[in-house]
Amino acid sequence: MKKVNTEAVVRNSFKKLRCRIRALVRNTSSNLVHDFRTEIKKLKAILNLFSTELKDPEDLKLPRRLKDIYRAAGSIRELQLQLSQTKRYKEYSALLIEVQTDREEHFRRIAQKKTIKKTRQRIMERLPGQLHQHTITLFRENKLKEIETIRALPQPSDDQMHTIRKNLKDIIYVQKIGDEKSIENPAVKEMKQATKELGKLNDLRTSIKYLRPVWINEIGYVERRKLVRLRTVRTRRKDALKKRIISEYPGFQFTRVSEE
């Protein structure tokens, strides 16, 4: 295993994060929101990995303020996805756009440079001096174990399916830290494909959330009926996709990453 400079890894992650936030404050396009959230997920996975080298793993938890910024961006992303699929419903789209505008203003208020700088300083002071190969192996195996536990359930919930996706993503994010060549491992490629399918499942779940009564009750009768039908269709599609994912990836054995 190559020697890992933990400070350099985290410093580079925060550098990218600052650039993402700076761009997002100016323009909350769907691509920029996605890039920012991906960078946060990578940082969180890295910190979780490094924390296993410490006596108190809580020292490297993602700070609350950074979580708040991440969630604010996520709430914008959800509406962007929903709007891209429901443009023909005029009243509904107008409602979502109004909410999205409020959420974008909230994001700009909390996405302050000082928050990122203070967060980085706090984390840099608590990083472990070195990272061992067995730490990466243990991190990965714990993620896989949780996946297998969920997969063994008769009917995994939507939340549990999302946990599988997050675990697979975490494995992918940290795998390159241990060995850059491992990112080409066929198992990792299969994991990426699985996360795409699980991402589609989560997108359907999110869409259904924004079609619940609390979001459409104030819409006119004709359009509301169409939205109710759309919710039914997407619920059926979600359930069918979940079954297909489970059947196509029995046991999620493909997630076993080579130690070579």
Model-flagged regions — what are they?
Residues 1-260:
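Function-determining surface determinants
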